[in-house]
Each structure stands twice: as C-alpha cells, then as structure tokens.
UniProtKB/Swiss-Prot annotation:
Protein family: Belongs to the radical SAM superfamily. MoaA family.
Record text on subunit structure and interactions: Monomer and homodimer.
Gene: moaA
Binding-site residues for S-adenosyl-L-methionine, renumbered to this chain: 56, 98, 149, 220
Name this protein carries in UniProt: GTP 3',8-cyclase
Pathway: Cofactor biosynthesis; molybdopterin biosynthesis
A Pfam short name: Radical_SAM
Organism: Mycolicibacterium smegmatis (strain ATCC 700084 / mc(2)155)
Length: 361
C-alpha cells in the first residue's frame, strides 16, 4: 500500500490581460487564490518561543526570539480573528507556536475566538509541557480539541530528539487532555532518522492503547540550521511498510477532503485496541491542490504557505489606523497570490528564512 498523491491544483492560472493572474483579488466571498482554492482554516502562531529544542527544529542554544513589542497584543489578535471569521469565511482556527502553552494569556485568546460569530472550531498544537495543569481551563475557555507533538515514547529517544528529559510531563498532558474532553486527542510525530521507524511502531501501539489518534508527518525543510536533506527523510511509503509488519491496516473509506493526513484503519490486536493512524506525506506526495490554509505569524504577518518567501504585514496596518476593510483587502491580496505548491521537490527550491518555530504548524 502507498499513500495517494493529491498533486498540484488543476485550476490553471491565466496570465493575459483580464485573466485571473492579472486581476485583483475578489473584494468579497471566500478567501480564494488564483488556483481556485478557498482558505477556511487559519493557523495562528502565538509565539516563536519554545521550551524544547528538537533537533529538526532549532539549535540547542535556542534562537533569537522576537521582541515583545513585535508580537500582536491580545486585542490586536482578537481583531484579526474577528475579521478572519466575519469577513473572510474562516471556519477553523488552530493556535500554534513555537509553543503556545508558554503564552500566559492563551486562555484569553481561546475565549476571544470562542466568542466569535459564527463560532469557528478552535484547536491547539502543543508539545504538551504544562498541559496537565491547563487542559481543563482551556476546555472551559472554548478549546475544542488538541494535537500534541510527540516523536517517541522511549525516554532515551525522546531526550535525544528534544534535548530535554520531559517525556513523563508530555504523557501526563495527553492524559489530562483526554480527561478534559479535548477529543479526539491527536499525536503528531516527526520521525528521527536514527530511531524513527522503531519509534513509529511503539507510538502507534501506545496511542491505540490509550485512545489517541497518531499522525506521522514527513520531516520538512523548516529547520533553523537549514541542514535538512531529502535523503534523511523517512517517507510515507517506508512508514506504511513498517507499520504493516506489526499491524493490520486497511485504507479509511471516508473522503479525505482537504485533510493533510491519509487515514488507515488499524484492526484490533493482542496488545492494542482498534483505531486509526494517519500519514502526512508533505514531501513525497504533495497535497497542495487541496490546501485550505492561511497563516498568521506571532508578529502579524500573513503567509499563504508554510514555504512562502513573501509575507504581508497586517501588524503595520493595525498600528497605522487601518480600518477592517483595508485589512481584509490586504489579507485577500496575500492569499490571491498563493503559489501552486510548496516547491520542495523543485531543483531551485529555497528554504524559507523563518524556521517552523517562527511560522507555526
């Protein structure tokens, strides 16, 4: 079995006068690009700071963090969320980092999103440190569900990958999220080239035993050191081949839609319950044609793609007195020029300057 490639958009970009490529972005309606894709999923990075130092993300000494006055205030962020939902048709908001749990006003931000009309689905991606004591409060604030990044349930492997000996804290956070009703609890894993395939098997077994849904993600070129190499990526086909040696997998029959993960049903076994596992083949089997995301960084920049090399500055507009219509127009223009695909496999691909920790997952 192999994953299915969704490929690049089939809606051609025109280039002549009066064409889609030459015309301005629509002034209303869905938040579309020139390839016909509509963005309904907003990814919001709340901070570039993180309390782990994962080897594929940032160096051991950390990075130069954004200064406090560069970050959007809760009031500024609430305004952009309102514009996104009320004027641009956003139906889902995911808060990310860096690590969003280091943000003290996280519950306030979640509550502001939950108060919007129409109310969007509100989700969070976190490394799980501190989640055990905040899961209940986040649920009360309006959080619907959660994704926890966890690359290994082997303590030594976890410490090597994250440069922190904190696996018990993450596992406690997962349990607290489930107890708080932030379900389905999903686990996001990026496989380490050294131990990743073994880790994938044990992760899936652990998730099935505890009622979590595992998503395994191909490592992407978003590390701060720009040392990513395609040859080191454990691709989706190898992941599936390995899992099939230990579990009985069948393709999930539900339409995939714009979801990045291709799902597989896992049959019950002697050591685990039945469940699902997803594989996100970001590199080897692009799904850019179905992308429905728009991204807002912690310092107020709009990115149309994880791998964009251009950004649109909404913070400047916010602080310069722009009205909602002007901000909406800038956001629409940013998304209108979204590229056809991420370009990772192009010979002239250039990694974005911002690392993943400063963009948000």
């Amino acid at each position: 079995m192999t994953v299915t490639a969704l490929g690049l958009p089939t809606v051609a970009r025109s280039t002549g006068d009066g064409s889609a490529g030459a015309s301005p972005a629509p002034a209303d309606g869905p938040l579309v690009d020139t390839y016909g894709r509509a963005a309904t999923d907003l990814r919001v990075s709340l901070t570039d700071r993180c309390n782990l130092r994962c080897t594929y993300c940032m160096p051991a000494e950390g990075l130069n963090w954004l200064p406090g006055d560069a970050l959007l205030s809760p009031t500024e962020l609430a305004r952009l969320l309102r514009i996104a939902v009320a004027r641009l048709g956003i139906t889902s908001v995911r808060f990310t980092g860096g690590e969003p749990l280091v943000v003290r006003h996280l519950e306030e931000v979640v509550a502001a999103a939950a108060a919007l009309e129409p109310r969007p689905e509100i989700t969070l991606t976190t490394n799980g440190l501190g989640l055990a004591r905040r899961a209940e409060g986040l649920k009360k604030a309006g959080l619907n569900r959660i994704n926890v990044s966890l690359d290994s349930v082997d303590a030594a492997h976890f410490a090597r990958i994250t440069r922190r000996d904190r696996l018990p804290d993450v596992l406690a956070g997962l349990a607290a999220a489930k107890a708080a009703g932030l379900e389905p609890v999903k686990v996001n894993a990026v496989l380490d080239p050294v131990s990743g395939l073994d880790d994938a098997v044990e992760l899936l077994r652990y998730c099935l035993q505890h009622g979590y849904q595992l998503r395994i993600i191909e490592q992407m070129p978003l590390d701060a050191s720009h040392s990513w190499q395609r040859d080191n990526v454990i691709d989706a086909d190898r992941i599936l081949q390995t899992l099939q040696q230990h579990f009985e997998l069948t393709p999930d029959s539900r339409p995939r839609g714009s979801a990045p993960a291709e799902l597989w049903q896992v049959a019950e076994g002697p050591t685990h319950a039945a469940g699902t596992v997803g594989v996100i083949a970001s590199v080897s089997h692009a799904f850019c044609s179905a992308c429905d995301r728009t991204r807002l960084t912690a310092d107020g920049q709009i990115r149309s793609c994880l791998f964009s090399r251009e950004e649109t500055d909404l913070r400047h507009l916010l602080r310069g007195g722009a009205d909602d219509a002007e901000i909406e127009a800038a956001w629409r223009a940013a998304m209108w020029s979204k590229p056809a695909g991420h370009g990772i496999n192009d010979p002239d691909f250039v990694q974005p300057v911002r690392p993943m920790s400063a963009i948000g997952g």
